[in-house]
A protein has these predicted regions:
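Extreme N-terminal tail/first-helix region
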Residues: 16-31
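Surface-exposed helix-capping loop/turn segments at secondary-structure junctions
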Residues: 44-51, 118-128, 163-168
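Short acidic-aromatic linear motifs embedded in glycine-rich loops, typified by GG[WY][YF]DAGD(H)
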Residues: 25-26, 87-103
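Short, Lys/Arg-enriched N-terminal segments with co-localized hydrophobic residues
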Residues: 2-18
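Residues within well-ordered alpha-helical secondary structure of globular protein domains
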Residues: 44, 67-70, 110
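Acidic/histidine-rich alpha-helical segments that form the ligand environment
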Residues: 95-132, 139-152
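Short, contiguous alpha-helical
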Residues: 28-32, 36-39, 49-92, 133-183
């Protein structure tokens, strides 16, 4: 069953949101941004491109999506969200397709939907507590940071694969002036 999360009420210190509130907000924002980028890439790729391995030492976009589902599922959904851990990490990399891209997107979306609920419900005590995950002993804070960093890292790899395969600009920052300086 689903555990109840502690300390979820909004807390303010000197009129500002408490650090756990800021962490939850920023972690969710960055994961959602990565999710949209991955969805955009997967939608653009054909089924063969989705499972294309550039060489023996690189995995496909499809493998990376499965790997992210496994990582988020294990570290957030199972460890912090109290779901059973059925991860088979090697299978994430051994899959060669042709898993339908719709199924792949749905798996990612379902994994992240639960993770968003879990992260959104974390309180100060959850972030400070030490948890055991994948053979490591980590605080809740370290788990959230790991998942966001890991998700972003592989989102970049998925973007690179897509750009290499399709020779496109992904348009992530279309309409934004990225040459603005701090004012």
């Amino acid at each position: 069953g689903r555990r109840s999360f502690s300390g979820r009420s909004r807390r303010y210190i000197h009129g500002m949101p408490a650090m756990d509130e800021i962490l939850r907000t920023e972690a969710l924002r960055r994961l959602r941004e990565g999710q949209e980028r991955i969805r955009s890439c997967v939608l653009r790729l054909g089924d063969e491109q989705l499972w294309h391995r550039p060489n023996a030492n690189l995995v496909s976009v499809g493998n990376l999506v499965l790997h992210l589902c496994g990582n988020v599922g294990q570290w957030i959904n199972s460890t912090l969200g109290n779901r059973p851990d059925h991860r088979r990490r090697d299978d994430e990399f051994n899959e060669t397709g042709p898993m339908d891209k719709r199924e792949l997107r749905e798996r990612l979306d379902a994994t992240l939907a639960y993770a968003y609920d879990v992260i959104g419900g974390l309180g100060q005590a959850d972030l400070e507590r030490t948890w055991n995950v994948q053979g490591f002993s980590e605080t809740g804070l370290a788990i959230v940071l790991h998942v966001v960093e890991h998700f972003s890292y592989h989102t970049g790899q998925i973007t690179l694969h897509t750009k290499l395969l399709l020779d496109i600009d992904t348009g992530y920052y279309a309409g934004q002036d990225l040459n603005r300086t701090a004012e």
